């Protein structure tokens, strides 16, 4: 899930004519950067067209001290000869992607950070993602038990030079939630936020 902190119309669809956004083809539509601590070691999990891929997890701490656990996938070629151990601090560059996985005869949307580069680092924790895509389901607006405004959207993000899209669930809060709630399916937006893994407990009435 992406928690968004900024949202803007892309002028290819609608919006202020003075906003001067670049077109989808002129910019990357999916950019993510994370600094965190390895909490699960890389292991080879699958192979595609002869190239092996490794999965691992990185823990990223927020200013509030809450922690997000981010699943990461990286190719063996991108990993190279680098070796990592639990507790290593790493800097990751890549994209936030999705794929469907069959679980109990049902398709489940799996989200992961696809790393194109990894390095050891002493930098502070970082969790940034920027997406440009299309709203592909009607936004769902609601209020939390603490009366905070929230809106869920599913964003289709096209991969450049690839006939595939990543479907990314996003959460917006406050004025951003109000802004996006009335937008229609097919609206293109530019978003900026963070990857969020914290599990929420839903409060039910007796």
Q: In which residue ranges do the predicted regions lie?
A:
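Single-stranded nucleic acid-binding surfaces, predominantly the OB-fold ssDNA-binding core
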Residues: 4-206
């Amino acid at each position: 899930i992406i928690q968004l902190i900024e949202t803007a119309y892309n002028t290819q669809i609608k919006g202020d004519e003075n906003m001067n956004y670049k077109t989808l083809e002129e910019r990357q539509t999916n950019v993510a950067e994370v600094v965190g601590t390895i909490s699960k070691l890389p292991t080879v999990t699958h192979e595609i067209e002869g190239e092996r891929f490794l999965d691992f997890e990185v823990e990223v701490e927020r200013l509030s001290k809450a922690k997000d656990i981010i699943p990461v996938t990286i190719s063996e070629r991108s990993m190279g000869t680098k070796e990592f151990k639990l507790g290593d601090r790493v800097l990751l560059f890549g994209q936030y992607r999705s794929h469907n996985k069959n679980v109990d005869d049902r398709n489940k949307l799996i989200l992961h950070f696809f790393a194109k580069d990894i390095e050891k680092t002493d930098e502070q924790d970082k969790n940034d993602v920027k997406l440009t895509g299309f709203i592909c389901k009607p936004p769902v607006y609601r209020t939390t038990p603490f009366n905070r405004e929230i809106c869920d959207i599913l964003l289709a993000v096209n991969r450049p030079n690839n006939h595939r899209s990543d479907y990314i669930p996003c959460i917006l809060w406050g004025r951003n939630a109000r802004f996006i709630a009335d937008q229609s399916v097919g609206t293109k937006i530019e978003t900026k936020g963070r990857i969020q893994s914290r599990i929420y407990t839903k409060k039910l009435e007796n």
